[in-house]
């Protein structure tokens, strides 16, 4: 059976979503191709604390549409393209940029590099990816999209706009059966983080959220800390790469700090990531809070968490707990790095979170500090594919 490297390629030209790179970080793991196909299939029963659901049988591929072909939309397609035997079939993209832009920006990416696939326009209404035709439509109103005509099963909602039931529900009105929001959902939309609470997924829910990239980084190792040592309270700071929601040069924005030039400043701003952990780990409600510092890097972010714990411990014991989880229930989700690396080294990491073991600290015997890296685009998009796989494998 073929083996794929579940790690980060080092050379810039290799940051392209390659399906067969032999380059890897010192802490990289090799998983079988079956394990890489989906985090669902690497250990379905191990995810979460309740023993998990059993993977269902998908007889035919589910038809998938991507709404919004921006950073997450394009990363999602590359991640999906790198999977073998996926139960998903991307057949449509809704984006206002049109076919030429969709094709060009998928092929050439300033962060990921050149996509190792034959990507080109196919007429005026579709793009071709290695010969696969994907229809491109353009409508800002999701309720008017041709999801019924195309037989769409799952919509990947990647605009960051339609994040409540009313907005995301427009895809259902248009004929789609399920919607996965690639952002924190608003209201009572169920939130799932793969490796944390995905075993609780209910097929009865037409709209679900994959949470934020930072919550996907934070929740897995917070789960370990709480289970092993008992979290009393804590605070988090994510030093986060700038995003499209900031201004390139000083310009109007509802957040006066985000109105300032993203590439020239450290920009303090809000994040709901810490509080959102309670959506997937309810016992931590009210125990965590945090802020974000947006910095002049285009990708990769790092979480700094400080918590007070009820069980006395020391740094080596904390790291040992992470290593144990990385080999068991959080395999493929959490990793531990022992090398003195920097942010660029984690670009295109498939993991949701990578603990920087040398930076783990314990003050006294009950205040724990943990530093964790994450690729806020690529790693997050891998989890979106995994969550879509969960939906597919539980299809009724």
Curated annotation (Swiss-Prot):
The active site is at 213 (nucleophile). It is an enzyme of class 1 (oxidoreductase). The gene is GAPA1. SUPFAM superfamilies: Glyceraldehyde-3-phosphate dehydrogenase-like, C-terminal domain, NAD(P)-binding Rossmann-fold domains. It is found in: Plastid, Chloroplast membrane; Plastid, Chloroplast stroma. It is a peripheral membrane protein. InterPro entries: GlycerAld/Erythrose_P_DH, GlycerAld_3-P_DH_AS, GlycerAld_3-P_DH_cat, GlycerAld_3-P_DH_NAD(P)-bd, Glyceraldehyde-3-P_DH_1, NAD(P)-bd_dom_sf. Involved in the photosynthetic reductive pentose phosphate pathway (Calvin-Benson cycle). Catalyzes the reduction of 1,3-diphosphoglycerate by NADPH. Induction: Repressed by darkness and sucrose. D-glyceraldehyde 3-phosphate binds at residues 212-214, 243, 258, 271-272, 294. One of its GO terms (cellular component) is chloroplast stroma. The keyword Transit peptide applies. Plants contain three types of GAPDH: NAD-dependent cytosolic forms which participate in glycolysis, NAD-dependent chloroplastic forms which participate in plastidic glycolysis and NADP-dependent chloroplastic forms which participate in the photosynthetic reductive pentose phosphate pathway (Calvin-Benson cycle). All the forms are encoded by distinct genes. Pfam families: Gp_dh_C (PF02800), Gp_dh_N (PF00044). The keyword Heme does not apply. Its EC number is 1.2.1.13. This is Glyceraldehyde-3-phosphate dehydrogenase GAPA1, chloroplastic. Keywords: Calvin cycle, Chloroplast, Membrane, NADP, Oxidoreductase, Plastid, Transit peptide. Belongs to the glyceraldehyde-3-phosphate dehydrogenase family.
């Amino acid at each position: 059976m073929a083996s794929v490297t579940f790690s980060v390629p080092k050379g810039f030209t290799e940051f392209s979503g390659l399906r067969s790179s032999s380059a890897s970080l010192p802490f990289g793991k090799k998983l079988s191709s079956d394990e890489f196909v989906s985090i669902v299939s690497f250990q379905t029963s191990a995810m979460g604390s309740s023993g998990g659901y059993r993977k269902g049988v998908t007889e035919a591929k589910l038809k998938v549409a991507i709404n919004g072909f921006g950073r997450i939309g394009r990363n999602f397609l590359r991640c999906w393209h790198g999977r073998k035997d996926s139960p998903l079939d991307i057949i449509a993209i809704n984006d206002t940029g049109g076919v030429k832009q969709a094709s060009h920006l998928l092929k050439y990416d300033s962060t990921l590099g050149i996509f190792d696939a034959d990507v080109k326009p196919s007429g005026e209404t579709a793009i071709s990816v290695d010969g696969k035709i994907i229809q491109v439509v353009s409508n800002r109103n999701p309720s008017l999209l041709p999801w019924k005509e195309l037989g769409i099963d799952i919509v990947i909602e990647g605009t960051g706009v339609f994040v409540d039931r009313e907005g995301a529900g427009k895809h259902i009105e248009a004929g789609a059966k399920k919607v996965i929001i690639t952002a924190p959902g608003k209201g009572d939309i169920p939130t799932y983080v793969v490796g944390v609470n995905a075993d609780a997924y209910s097929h009865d829910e037409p709209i679900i959220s994959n949470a934020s990239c930072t919550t996907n980084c934070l929740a897995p190792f917070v789960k370990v800390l709480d289970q092993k040592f008992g979290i009393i309270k804590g605070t988090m700071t994510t030093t986060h790469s700038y995003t499209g929601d900031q201004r390139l040069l000083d310009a109007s924005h509802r957040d006066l700090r985000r109105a300032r030039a993203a590439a020239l400043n450290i920009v303090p701003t809000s994040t709901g990531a810490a509080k959102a952990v309670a959506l997937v780990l309810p016992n931590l409600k009210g125990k965590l809070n945090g802020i974000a510092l947006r910095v002049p890097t285009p990708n990769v972010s790092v979480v700094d968490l400080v918590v007070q714990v009820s069980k006395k411990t020391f740094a080596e014991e904390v790291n040992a707990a992470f290593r144990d989880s990385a080999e068991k229930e959080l395999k493929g989700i959490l990793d531990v790095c022992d090398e003195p690396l920097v942010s660029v080294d984690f670009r295109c990491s498939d993991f949701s979170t990578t603990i920087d073991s040398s930076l783990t600290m314990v003050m006294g015997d009950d205040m724990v500090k943990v530093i964790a890296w994450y690729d806020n685009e690529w790693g997050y998009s891998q989890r979106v594919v995994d969550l879509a796989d969960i939906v597919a494998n539980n299809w009724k």
